[in-house]
């Protein structure tokens, strides 16, 4: 379990992880690390929340919220944001399914991807700022949001097919079991409830339903999921959870 956690931490974040704790794992061990995704999110969100909390007395709510969101983006290396941008460039291109997938593989940022990044990042800054004004603890809110965002991404992995022939997403999509999916989501919901009580539970359940709907819509549009759509689900899951706290 410890090795799985550090494998997941090195896979979906930019935090330094000792090689002896994350390397030399079999493919199956990486796949089993899905159950630790909410714990990785918990850590990343707690760090970002701490940044916002520490800066608030010094620079005020708006800038504290901005730097908290910036910290989260830096901690992940923009990994999930890149997936969000690529997904939006593809699905809003109004092309054939194959062409959409081609566009998503293109590393260049398009108009729809740029707009998606602006909207999501601005929305996160605004909602984190509003939560600070409402005296909702930023460490608890961001830790829970990141845990739930990563936990609910399992909905796009279980019983979905990989829309391409190869890629990083193929490590998880269609490869995790029902038990792993349920454990991952249950852990995310439990963490949100422990941190924020019934408010966290309600927000987690709302996020679950909406991310399930997102997965269904992406499956209809693309014929399956990719690593990019997983990144999009994580980013949107975080935002939806934070909005549901308001």
UniProtKB/Swiss-Prot annotation:
Q: What is its EC number?
A: 2.7.8.26
Catalytic reaction list: alpha-ribazole + adenosylcob(III)inamide-GDP = adenosylcob(III)alamin + GMP + H(+); alpha-ribazole 5'-phosphate + adenosylcob(III)inamide-GDP = adenosylcob(III)alamin 5'-phosphate + GMP + H(+)
Which leading EC class covers this enzyme?
Answer: transferase
Which Gene Ontology terms cover its molecular function? adenosylcobinamide-GDP ribazoletransferase activity; cobalamin 5'-phosphate synthase activity
Write out the GO cellular component annotations.
plasma membrane
Q: Look up the record and name the pathway of this protein.
A: Cofactor biosynthesis; adenosylcobalamin biosynthesis; adenosylcobalamin from cob(II)yrinate a,c-diamide: step 7/7
Q: Where are the transmembrane segments?
A: 34-54, 59-79, 113-133, 136-156, 181-201, 203-223
Name the Gene Ontology biological process terms: cobalamin biosynthetic process
Q: Does the keyword Calcium apply?
A: no
Q: What does this protein do?
A: Joins adenosylcobinamide-GDP and alpha-ribazole to generate adenosylcobalamin (Ado-cobalamin). Also synthesizes adenosylcobalamin 5'-phosphate from adenosylcobinamide-GDP and alpha-ribazole 5'-phosphate.
Q: Give the similarity note.
A: Belongs to the CobS family.
Q: Which HAMAP family match?
A: CobS
Record's protein name: Adenosylcobinamide-GDP ribazoletransferase
